[in-house]
Amino acid sequence: MGKDTIADIITCIRNADMNRKGTVRIVSTNITENIVKILLREGFIENARKHQERNKYFLVLTLRHRRNKKGPYLNTFHLKRVSRPGLRIYSNYQRIPRILGGMGIAILSTSRGIMTDREARLEGIGGEILCYIW
């Protein structure tokens, strides 16, 4: 049985966000680096840096937290894995779903690389829907 690295990074980020951790360390692969670049560009995380430990590379992510000084802790974002190894979900560019009316993003794996739903619609290409973020 193979390992689902996308589900692993989504779970690590979600757990760290729920436990109010400032940083997360995830395994660095080409797919995870591309997803982290999208998260940085869209403003869901503050910082990402590459770290080497015993010939293994890790990405150390700094999460963006919004704290209301008078009220409770505000959860930053939600992540949901859509396509998984047992059930792949594909979509053409016309049927890519809009997340919260355009407030969230969908990350797609296309023939031109990993990109957001907006970029895929602009380029007119579809692909495998990896996850939703809102």
From Swiss-Prot:
Lineage start: Eukaryota, Viridiplantae, Streptophyta, Embryophyta, Tracheophyta
Q: List the disulfide bonds.
A: none
What does the annotation say about its assembly with partners? Component of the chloroplast small ribosomal subunit (SSU). Mature 70S chloroplast ribosomes of higher plants consist of a small (30S) and a large (50S) subunit. The 30S small subunit contains 1 molecule of ribosomal RNA (16S rRNA) and 24 different proteins. The 50S large subunit contains 3 rRNA molecules (23S, 5S and 4.5S rRNA) and 33 different proteins.
Q: Which organism is it from?
A: Spinacia oleracea
Matches recorded under InterPro entries: Ribosomal_uS8 (IPR000630), Ribosomal_uS8_CS (IPR047863), Ribosomal_uS8_sf (IPR035987)
Q: What is this protein called?
A: Small ribosomal subunit protein uS8c
Query: Listed GO molecular functions?
Result: rRNA binding; structural constituent of ribosome
**Which SUPFAM superfamilies does this entry report, sorted A to Z?**
Ribosomal protein S8
Q: Does the record bear Nucleotide-binding in its keywords?
A: no
One Gene Ontology BP term is:
translation
Which Pfam families does the entry link to?
A: Ribosomal_S8 (PF00410)
A GO CC annotation recorded here is: ribonucleoprotein complex
Keyword list (alphabetical) reads: Chloroplast, Plastid, Ribonucleoprotein, Ribosomal protein, RNA-binding, rRNA-binding
